[in-house]
Amino acid sequence: MARIAGIDLPRDKRIVIGLTYIYGIGNTTAQKVLAEAGVSEDVRVRDLTSDQEDAIRATVDKLNLQLEGDLRRKVSLDIKSLQEIASYRGIRHRKGLPVRGQNTKNNARTRKGPAKAIAGKKK
């Protein structure tokens, strides 16, 4: 099993898909890494040679990508700083509402959580 950036990649997936299991690497970055490492995108993770694994590791290190824990920490610190300066976005984060301008009158249930029951009109 290939281990890159501290993550075990799934053996049965193509390497271009397997790399996206690392937090901070999406499709485009995975393709760039493989192109620079000289590895085909169609190779399965289980079929990688140790030389190919080393080339991928070296390329990921060389690109200076923030991955996994560092990236998660950076995102949470950015959100925390928005909340501390009481910006509009920070307030929306604190209240658990959509941050990017979506309407909340009818939708936004994912962000707001389950609907709270309101007592109906008595007959």
Swiss-Prot record:
UniProt-listed HAMAP family: Ribosomal_uS13
InterPro entries associated with the record: Rbsml_uS13_C, Ribosomal_uS13, Ribosomal_uS13-like_H2TH, Ribosomal_uS13_bac-type, Ribosomal_uS13_CS
Biological-process GO terms, alphabetical: translation
Family: Belongs to the universal ribosomal protein uS13 family.
Cited PROSITE patterns: RIBOSOMAL_S13_1, RIBOSOMAL_S13_2
One Gene Ontology CC term in the entry: cytosol
Region called Disordered, residue ranges: 93-123
Functional description taken from the UniProt entry: Located at the top of the head of the 30S subunit, it contacts several helices of the 16S rRNA. In the 70S ribosome it contacts the 23S rRNA (bridge B1a) and protein L5 of the 50S subunit (bridge B1b), connecting the 2 subunits; these bridges are implicated in subunit movement. Contacts the tRNAs in the A and P-sites.
Gene field: rpsM
Keywords carried by this UniProt record: Ribonucleoprotein, Ribosomal protein, RNA-binding, rRNA-binding, tRNA-binding
Protein name: Small ribosomal subunit protein uS13
Compositional bias segments (type: Basic residues): 108-123
PANTHER family assigned: 30S RIBOSOMAL PROTEIN S13/40S RIBOSOMAL PROTEIN S18, SMALL RIBOSOMAL SUBUNIT PROTEIN US13M
Record Pfam families: Ribosomal_S13
The organism of origin for this protein: Leuconostoc mesenteroides subsp. mesenteroides (strain ATCC 8293 / DSM 20343 / BCRC 11652 / CCM 1803 / JCM 6124 / NCDO 523 / NBRC 100496 / NCIMB 8023 / NCTC 12954 / NRRL B-1118 / 37Y)
Complex and partners: Part of the 30S ribosomal subunit. Forms a loose heterodimer with protein S19. Forms two bridges to the 50S subunit in the 70S ribosome.
GO molecular function: rRNA binding; structural constituent of ribosome; tRNA binding
